[in-house]
């Protein structure tokens, strides 16, 4: 038995499912999950000493690569001053200043501890600011595990929300309306049904939790127009896309201005951090200046914020996003060529430093229904073949892949060669 397998067996006796987040259990691909001992640059090393080129990147935060010296030093320096104070610190002000400079739609920002806290808080703020209760989200888009957002569509796009998890009261979930991603007509119909009841629309600008599905050109501008028409707030969830697809986020890449933005992952540099911000007048509704309550004992933790601040300073350097995009494009082109040579139907979606692989005969993948129609069994086989070749992809057909600045020509070449051999065995 491998050391990873031994650790997993022990963990299953102590931790629900043996993991602290479900996707880590490899349920989407089968087999025993890797237990990681260390990471550096573009590579992970597991508990058995095996090395892998990593395209998970801790599910997005590691845009610079693992164990980046600037982030490591920032954490070490911060630890010397203390771990947590429960009081304001200078680094919070610096971080807020940097975020407002990099993302122009954010005029005021509050730090929290996770992406889930960020989305949960923006929904509460939108409801409190507008005095409305209903929320529109999109099928296949994930916004954390807050009760009101763990909802999917019923038999039709405008069916009242049905909980996706036990423990979410139906009476609460009914305030969440689920529309089809990239389908503006379904959103207009929702607004027509509830013209003065919808507080906000929350959307992943690139849907990264149904693999990687970019918006159609008219989708995000159309959401902005519908929100303006019906007096709702537009919330762009950039927990995954923020500072990855473009320096100013997907909202800069696609030129759309939200009322509120959710951030996470990269802004922590690998530490647990989230944030939300937006129009000053909306953010002023938060306590202590307004009536909408939001708080957190560890919010703005000085060690975590120091890591995130160092990460953003590096990400903001000239040429970073051009490099991410170029390397992701090289990987995508190599994978497509290898798949074509093996006669394997494959679609590769990509935006900036994000990408997604879809085993499908369809020429495009633009919505959740397209994703569901893909060959998941073929992906499972491909995942394990790649893992055996030293390449670690997301262990789910419904999760995006992530490029980092540490992925160089050698890593991409090895990945494409491994993929060619794997495609030949599918």
Curated annotation (Swiss-Prot):
GO terms for molecular function: glutamate-1-semialdehyde 2,1-aminomutase activity; pyridoxal phosphate binding; transaminase activity. Its EC number is 5.4.3.8. GO terms for biological process: protoporphyrinogen IX biosynthetic process. It holds the Pfam family Aminotran_3. GO terms for cellular component: cytoplasm. Keywords: Cytoplasm, Isomerase, Porphyrin biosynthesis, Pyridoxal phosphate. Pathway: Porphyrin-containing compound metabolism; protoporphyrin-IX biosynthesis; 5-aminolevulinate from L-glutamyl-tRNA(Glu): step 2/2. PROSITE patterns: AA_TRANSFER_CLASS_3 (PS00600). CDD domains: OAT_like (cd00610). InterPro entries: 4pyrrol_synth_GluAld_NH2Trfase (IPR004639), Aminotrans_3 (IPR005814), Aminotrans_3_PPA_site (IPR049704), PyrdxlP-dep_Trfase (IPR015424), PyrdxlP-dep_Trfase_major (IPR015421), PyrdxlP-dep_Trfase_small (IPR015422). The modification N6-(pyridoxal phosphate)lysine is found at residue 265. Its cofactor is pyridoxal 5'-phosphate. It comes from the Bacteria. It is found in: Cytoplasm. Its main location: cytoplasm. It catalyses: (S)-4-amino-5-oxopentanoate = 5-aminolevulinate. Homodimer. Belongs to the class-III pyridoxal-phosphate-dependent aminotransferase family. HemL subfamily. This is Glutamate-1-semialdehyde 2,1-aminomutase. It comes from Sodalis glossinidius (strain morsitans).
